Amino acid sequence: MGANRLAGGALPLQVGAGTMATGSSWAWKPIARNALFARAYHSCDVVQGKLLLFGGLKSGEPKEPPLGDMVAFDPTLLTAETVGPNGGDRRSHHDTAVLANRWLCVVGGWDGAHRVSAVCCWDTEQGQWERWAEGPSNDPPVGLSSHTCTKVSEHELRVVGREGGLRTQRRFASIYTLRVNPATKTYWYKEEESRTASRAGHSAMLLRDAGGYQLVVFGGRDSSDCEVAGRWGKGKIHVESIHAPKMTEQLSRLVGSENGSRQAPKGLRHQSCTVVGPFAVAFGGETLTKGRDTVCNDLYVYDTRCSPPSWFRFPCSDRGQKRVGHRTCLWNDKLYLVGGFGPDGKTPCPEICVLEIP
């Protein structure tokens, strides 16, 4: 569908394509279909009202290099365009943070040959990549992939975990504070004294608590343990919370129909996870508890309104909605599902869907 058009060229979309995938009381409704969306282990962030997709893999072939293109999807107009051609840094299994609603900060990832810890930024106002330099006190990890990078403020990110096979999995995972300065285009890592269990392909949730905020991580290893990877007082976090009253009310109604559990999903990795008010919504991923048919399509809701918080699982009977290496984004009171590999774990899905809870 013209996926090789030059940067800046708007592309026609198939709108409303596909069928709705339903769980018992929820549904992923396809709203757009385009070859540009067909990727996995990419990033997806909202910048200036558009969803920016960067990098990822087009197939499950181990020798295929990652993508390096930047695609912008307008959720209001349902239009897409390539805003950055496939000529810059290539990345998959990376993570991102948006600074000042302008810079898309890409942290670490797999470049096709190595795991890297370098930081590069896409300037949405200039429409170009910026190569940021290491600061004088930089103490970087050896390499990062399948890690998480969580924004704490406009100048501070928290990086947790990195790749490691189950047989060679390290006992502990280091936690890094990553300082960033868009004015000087510099960054520097500092390793924290605290650690978590070794994780890769996990999720990180920045959640409010009585004292301020805590960063909770789950998944990415063969257990159901949740861990706290950082705590901050109320005045230390400078991140805008996204207003989503409709979706918050829908999630409240959804969990009200089920019994929760204190146990997080066991042995799940490469799922998506997005915080929505007092909830976190996780979907899909790959289970480590089975040898075959490992890609999942369950929806999980983490409810922090009670103490201790509870997990709620909502299964889906539609195998076609199994996803791994996908992303979810919250924008304008809607949760978007973008890309990922399908049930076979190697064929990318070219759809963008929205979560519907009747």
Would you name each region that the model predicts?
Residues 1-358:
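Kelch-like beta-propeller repeat domains
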